[in-house]
From Swiss-Prot:
Membrane topology: Multi-pass membrane protein
UniProt name for this protein: Taste receptor type 2 member 5
Gene behind this protein: TAS2R5
Cytoplasmic side: 23-45, 104-127, 197-223, 275-299
Subcellular location: Membrane
Length: 299
């Protein structure tokens, strides 16, 4: 029989899954609708589409692992699931890095010649360099994940050598994350500096258009800060999620760590929706119509 704590964790996991499913689904539909409306892809729409798609896959992988991990413990399918999981996780981080670079290019205002040159000429080159590094890191992750050797199972009380997979999983998860994290932090730092210099200018000049630019700075920083916090929680919870599945598994620990991991692809989608005015207004209208319909048809 399930305990009250385990039942609560299951409820939270279901709520997170539904929030992420709806949020990422809205972002995917919005990106495709913008493409149909304009018959062209913008950089921002492509980044949002890729980010939402990766989060959508990551959510289903978490649910799949949470539901079927007892069946995968003694199966080679766990190795392939683990590799695919790492690839999707790294792709999500890279799309978030592209988003931070996009914000930095569109919002920051510096008058220094070096920055103007970087903004005008080196932006596209930097994206191609990041894409090349991303492909290399994916290939290395696949090679490490698919060539790892499993020791014989024998009569061990642990059906699957999780102590070995723990270190392998952490290595796989972090091997391709160092460069995008550095770029992400540099871009976020430039946004903070730009907001600070803009705030100083506002003290001298009148408000007006500069208020909109300050609001854009704050919205971008909220989205990037939320992503960084949730991603760090996801990274910390990942190895503990693996070790909690040793045989016999501790279901309470499994749900605690998996719920923390599921917050990453679910909650950040809400921050992205709040940062897109048209999507935010559409969601508010839908919620308002739903509430009104419930009041009209309710008892």
């Amino acid at each position: 029989m399930l305990s009250a704590g385990l039942g609560l964790l299951m409820l939270v996991a279901v709520i997170e899954f539904l929030i992420g499913l709806i949020g990422n689904g809205i972002l995917v539909v919005w990106s495709l609708r913008e493409w149909i409306r304009k018959f062209s892809w913008s950089s921002y729409n492509l980044i949002i589409l890729g980010l939402a798609g990766c989060r959508f896959l990551l959510q289903w992988l978490i649910i799949l692992d949470l539901s079927l991990f007892p069946l995968f413990q003694s199966s080679s399918w766990l190795r392939y699931l683990n590799v695919f999981w790492v690839l999707v996780s790294q792709a999500s981080l890279w799309f978030a890095t592209f988003l931070s670079v996009f914000y930095c290019k569109k919002i920051t205002t510096f008058d220094r010649p070096a920055y103007l040159w970087l903004k005008q000429r080196a932006y596209n080159l930097s994206l191609w360099c990041l894409l090349g590094y991303f492909i290399i890191s994916l290939l290395l992750t696949v090679q490490v994940g698919l060539t790892v050797h499993h020791p014989p199972q024998g009569n061990s009380s642990i059906r699957y050598p999780f102590e070995h997979w723990q270190y392998l999983y952490v290595f796989q998860l972090n091997s391709g994350s160092y460069l995008p994290l550095m770029v992400f932090l540099v871009s976020s730092g430039m946004l903070i500096i730009s907001l600070y210099t803009h705030h100083k200018k506002m003290k001298v000049h009148s408000a007006g258009r500069r208020d909109a630019r300050a609001k854009a700075h704050i919205t971008a920083l909220k989205s990037l800060g939320c992503f960084l916090l949730l991603h760090l929680v996801y990274i910390v919870a990942s190895p503990f999620s693996i070790t909690s599945k040793t045989y016999p598994p501790d279901l309470t620990s499994v749900f605690i760590w998996e719920t923390l991991m599921a917050a990453y692809p679910s909650l950040h989608s809400l921050m992205l929706i709040m940062g897109i005015p048209r999507v935010k207004q559409t969601c508010q209208k839908i919620l308002w119509k739903t509430v009104c319909a419930r009041r009209c048809w309710g008892p």
